[in-house]
UniProtKB/Swiss-Prot annotation:
SUPFAM superfamilies: LuxS/MPP-like metallohydrolase (SSF63411). InterPro entries: LuxS_sf, Metalloenz_LuxS/M16, S-ribosylhomocysteinase. Fe cation binds at residues 54, 58, 128. Keywords: Autoinducer synthesis, Iron, Lyase, Metal-binding, Quorum sensing. The keyword Lipid metabolism does not apply. This is S-ribosylhomocysteine lyase. It comes from Shewanella sediminis (strain HAW-EB3).
């Protein structure tokens, strides 16, 4: 099985909250797709609560589009990581990490403005596969912790696992 890009970086050295360009690629038509690692938690030290990450999934995807989409950027998808330490965001374009961090902070402030659970988008059995597994309180607690900590940048060249380590795993 091929080694995926996300497993070639040293998770023991990742900082969080942090933005990382996980991958860039070009489509056959020449559009650039950028995949961002939006790391909310330090891997193997912290984890996002199940209800909190699910509620953030519903809120964060829309708020990030509000703050980042424009003439040169269009978000394709924002999805939670299986390890529950953050989200992957795929988009058309090449926004700077600082712009992504600004949009992320603005989105966290938007999460804090949601007044009640009923305002969570797509919170019903028709549009959500586990519509009763949500917590606005937990999502807002996560947002507050991101705002308080601030967002940094993880660089691939600083996190790259050596061939020696990869071959020994």
């Amino acid at each position: 099985m091929p080694l995926l890009d996300s497993f070639t970086v040293d998770h023991t050295r990742m900082q969080a909250p942090a933005v990382r360009i996980a991958k860039t690629m070009k489509t056959p038509k020449g559009d650039v797709i950028t995949v961002f690692d939006l790391r909310f938690c330090v891997p193997n030290k912290e984890i996002l609560s199940e209800r909190g990450i699910h509620t953030l999934e519903h809120l964060y995807a829309g708020f990030m589009r509000d703050h980042l989409n424009g003439d040169s950027v269009e978000i394709i998808d924002i999805s939670p990581m299986g390890c529950r330490t953050g989200f992957y965001m795929s988009l058309i374009g090449t926004p700077a990490e600082a712009d992504v961090a600004q949009a992320w902070l603005a989105s966290m402030n938007d999460v804090l403005k949601v007044a009640e659970q009923a305002q969570i988008p797509e919170l019903n059995e028709y549009q959500c596969g586990t519509f009763d597994m949500h917590s606005l309180d937990q999502a807002q607690s996560i947002a507050r912790s991101i705002i308080a900590a601030g967002i940094t940048v993880n660089k691939n060249d600083e996190l790259k696992l050596s061939d020696e380590i990869l071959n020994g795993l």
